């Protein structure tokens, strides 16, 4: 009976994963700038056959190392030129992270129910789902940090020297791949997570003795590419270390500056539909650190990265994704160890929290649809879009309500709360957002004009990347704003890839002699102020914030 229940639960989790992570993947437009950027970088890598030096729009792009791009490359190579292939590497990495969570739970507690629950909590947590189906590098670096977490557990349980050597070698492998995916950050997180555990368990000597092995393995793994990119681009490491690491995280002009408490609300919302488990799980990691040292180990891997990112001046929501694997394990272990009566009470509280959460968000969508919160957020004729958005959260409430019926057996049905959101969110986004963040619709609507243009320009890098991806051409010229390609545009061979607004009339007069010109703009607001003073186009197409100015060739 027990085995059949475990098999049934495993099947349900696999089906839920397919419905959440795979089925909707191709049905949502790519978001700008992140998804269009990563889609185009890998498309160009495949087209150029250059897997060493990253380029975007055929311009040097040194913001990240290459391992994440390699995974995206393989996805596009295997699955073709689709939105599914753009996002698949993120989904694949998230699935592997969930498997590592399951295996680690089995290693720590040898209980399949707890292990399945940990994997389920991880996969259905709102933040993990949101980032895990979005084409960024964070799910990939999270995979390697989860592998480092797994390796650390092996280190703590190793008895023989050869077991320690293997575990520390695997730690080095995970750190090396993390470094190859997102840089020095992937080396810092394991160090700050391992250190307090070593201090608490008086294993500093072991850390000093075997830790260098992990460093050697990480260096050996990353050295071939690191040397190859240095040979090709001597300034790569200077830019990548000082600009991308020091300035981004530490200096006063760091990118994405935010206060210390920035991540707290995202942590709270990101743990839905399991929020009620959060306080007790974190508390148990500290109060039971002597009775259950594995919980303190997990707490360190969750809290130390969170503190690190909170102290850093530059902050982005996606940075805290690596915190959720140890958090899911802590939650599963804590609730599994509660007395049945206490567990049922906690699950009931959790269900009601989800009912309130779904109700508030459903009402928020309705209020947006009526123009109460933000006027004109939804446009006339978008009734079905509004209904779709409301149904997303009616589904959330429905799963939470059903889970109230029999808490002992049905309490974990809250795992299905995100299902309607996952399936319907693509059809719930208003046109005002689509026409400012999802350039594919606008590009496809005007594809004949764009394909008939010898020169295509854009005033935003994310939009330019979207044009390059859709048109399968990397020679998009930047207009007026250099954005994140500012560094690459300083190279002599990229001098003709940027046109200043003041020089545009003369540039246009010259280029129109040899072909049509298309200028695609993303305006700050729904007005003509930003293009009123430009040369008059032959055709002007506009949809909310996206504008296309088409200049027909002038035959000399």
From Swiss-Prot:
Keywords for the protein's UniProt record, in alphabetical order: Cell inner membrane, Cell membrane, Glycosyltransferase, Lipid A biosynthesis, Lipid biosynthesis, Lipid metabolism, Lipopolysaccharide biosynthesis, Membrane, Transferase, Transmembrane, Transmembrane helix
GO CC, one annotated term: plasma membrane
Disulphide linkage map: none
Cellular location(s): Cell inner membrane
Membrane topology: Multi-pass membrane protein
InterPro entries: ArnT_tfrase, Glyco_trans_39/83, LipidA_mod_glycosyltrf_83
GO terms for MF: 4-amino-4-deoxy-L-arabinose transferase activity; mannosyltransferase activity
Pfam families, alphabetized: PMT
Transmembrane segments: 88-108, 116-136, 179-199, 207-227, 258-278, 296-316, 319-339, 355-375, 384-404, 410-430
Pathway of action: Lipopolysaccharide metabolism; 4-amino-4-deoxy-beta-L-arabinose-lipid A biosynthesis
Gene Ontology biological process: lipid A biosynthetic process; lipopolysaccharide biosynthetic process; protein O-linked glycosylation; response to iron(III) ion
EC numbers, comma separated: 2.4.2.43
Main subcellular localisation: membrane
Catalytic reaction equation(s): 4-amino-4-deoxy-alpha-L-arabinopyranosyl di-trans,octa-cis-undecaprenyl phosphate + lipid IVA = lipid IIA + di-trans,octa-cis-undecaprenyl phosphate
Family: Belongs to the glycosyltransferase 83 family.
Function: Catalyzes the transfer of the L-Ara4N moiety of the glycolipid undecaprenyl phosphate-alpha-L-Ara4N to lipid A. The modified arabinose is attached to lipid A and is required for resistance to polymyxin and cationic antimicrobial peptides.
Record's protein name: Undecaprenyl phosphate-alpha-4-amino-4-deoxy-L-arabinose arabinosyl transferase
The organism of origin for this protein: Pectobacterium atrosepticum (strain SCRI 1043 / ATCC BAA-672) (Erwinia carotovora subsp. atroseptica)
Underlying gene: arnT
